[in-house]
Amino acid sequence: MIQSAAPSCRRWWALGFAAVALWVDSTSGWTTQRPPMAGLRRFQSSAWYMSSSSTEKPTTSGTINGGGGKQKAASQPKKTAGIVYDAQKIRNFSIIAHIDHGKSTLADRLLETTQTVAQRDMEAQLLDNMDLERERGITIKLQAARVLYQARDGEMYCLNLIDTPGHVDFSYEVSRSLAACEGALLVVDASQGIEAQTLANVYLALENDLEIIPILNKIDLPAADPERVAEEIEATIGLDCSGIVHASAKTGIGIDDILERIVQMVPPPPAATGGPFRALIFDSYYDAYRGVIVFFRVMDGEVSQGDKVRFLASDAEHDVTEVGIMQPNQVPVDCLHAGEVGYLWGNIKDVLDARVGDTIVLAKEYKESASKGKSPPIEALPGYADSVPMVYCGLFPVDADQYESLRDALGKLRLNDAALSYEPESSGAMGFGFRCGFLGLLHMEIVQERLQREYDIDLIVTAPSVVYKVKKEHQEEFFIDTPAKMPDLGRNDVALEPYVRMEVLTPSEYNGAIIELGQERRGDLIDIKFLTPTRSTIVYELPLAEVITDFFDQLKSRTKGYASMEYSLIDYRASDLVRLDVKINYEMAPPLACVVHRDKAQSIGRRLCASLKDLIPRQMFKIPIQACIGVKVIASESISPMRKDVLAKCYGGDISRKKKLLQKQAKGKKRMKSIGKVNVPQEAFMAVLKLNE
């Protein structure tokens, strides 16, 4: 036993190899074993003392989730093993911002200021775990973290930060994350002002009835203009910016004020009074050793280790092996109550069992309600929807021997990404591969890059396409996700394509260029709003097929990089669409087929043939390239053959000798043309992307 010189002196001793804490009392000589921990700092940060006064201390130390039992009413704090659980001291919030406005940096400063993460463990973009996220400077997979903060009123508050992806491709995931919160920090760059994604995130926050706290970030930049940007926010969004927080996530300016605003303005979560357990899933990922890890927000009731839970959308049931909180590393606890954010795992092998937006309930409570004849036994939380792919493309391995490797790699990515869909596809020109569905172009690029980087697979990627609807006479409508599957339409048949509503924020001097671009892409101008005398927003409705190619590149080019855009799917509309086929050496090339509007078919066919002529290498025989609608050729080009001078060895003599050599060469080229194969490079398949230039 370790003796102390001072009477009644209590000390913590951490045994690093066993991660066990001993509480030694020198007067009584007894020890108490504490729960496993990663060190004294970790245990102190996970202990949460709640009392009516900041000077009161519980007699026994532990975490907030020290025991089980049914939760009392929200007005009566619940004591568990000497710990007071008080939902009124919980604040669930998210950070929303346009790309590169400082969202991840602000999250780093909040974790650092509250000492949630030790200074030696801090690194830039702490919540961004993937290398791709750090390289691109974007958030792809959302994260969550619990922060303990002692406010200026002396009370200790539990702040649950739920980080969100910032790109429009992941808007559904963002909406489910915001549904798990009561408040949101709206971060706006003080030098750039409001951008398109800023407005999109604000709309999502308003739909979920969140308290929005505006923050001007990067005020330390020489180009910062806080007064102008604050006026933009008031004029555009309608938020009161009289007391807006001026902050710099890089230098730490204003971080304490932000924490105080969270405590004062974000309402506490509504706590249920004895209802059944319900929780909202806002993210999940696959771990090779533990299976699927589910991140959720408890809406009603409580869940403990050992409970059996049911996922309502998939009807899957699993035993809970572990529940815990994120700080931001995962820390196991005994129980999670209404209003808290945490994780669970329990030998779940398929991420489809725990989809984003689904509702978790206790299997026992579900069966009890079902036995009483309730329908449904437990009401699901609103807002769940299956992820619907918006963009499709073909992925083919360069080496045919890597087909199995590609299938295994897609299966592993699918475990972490429920929005990714794929099915086998074969092509005479490309061999065997997969037809993959994605939420958008960024999602597609990320999956391709991960396949090449993490699994070392060289890919041939076909041009992306959207999903079309076809209504044939006397038949039910059906979907087309591959241009080669588009049928020839009769007089009474109808083809429909997806339309999006797009908002473009731009300096007003570029309004004309953007309107011209919208008209070129078959768009309908809906509205023009002037946010300030120098900035405006232009609203268009246009086909998604015109957006997924090079629209964003053209927008940046015509506005010198100043414009930003955001779009959302609205509906399907009838269009005069045709399938444009490409024949190379009189053979159909299905990967190069595309669906276009009839009015643009001839011009697009000419540009496509011209592009392929430049990209396909010359052969020893002539290669014709044809663009066709049905059996009608609307454009054509030909690649001239490389010429071999068979007369070089003839130095005069009879002309018949030369004719014989030329006839022999022509005969050989004719045979070569009939059996020869044309190698089409990867760049040729992406030529479809540049047809609108």
UniProtKB/Swiss-Prot annotation:
GO terms for biological process: positive regulation of translation; translation. The keyword Methyltransferase does not apply. It comes from the Eukaryota. It catalyses: GTP + H2O = GDP + phosphate + H(+). GO terms for cellular component: mitochondrial inner membrane; mitochondrial matrix. The keyword Endoplasmic reticulum does not apply. Disulfide bonds: none annotated. Residues 51-78 are annotated as: Disordered. Its main location: mitochondrion. Keywords: GTP-binding, Hydrolase, Membrane, Mitochondrion, Mitochondrion inner membrane, Nucleotide-binding, Protein biosynthesis. It is a peripheral membrane protein. Residues 88-270 form the tr-type G domain. Pfam families: EFG_C (PF00679), GTP_EFTU (PF00009), GTP_EFTU_D2 (PF03144), LepA_C (PF06421). Belongs to the TRAFAC class translation factor GTPase superfamily. Classic translation factor GTPase family. LepA subfamily. HAMAP family: LepA. This protein may be expected to contain an N-terminal transit peptide but none has been predicted. This is Translation factor GUF1 homolog, mitochondrial. The lineage of its organism: Eukaryota, Sar, Stramenopiles, Ochrophyta, Bacillariophyta.
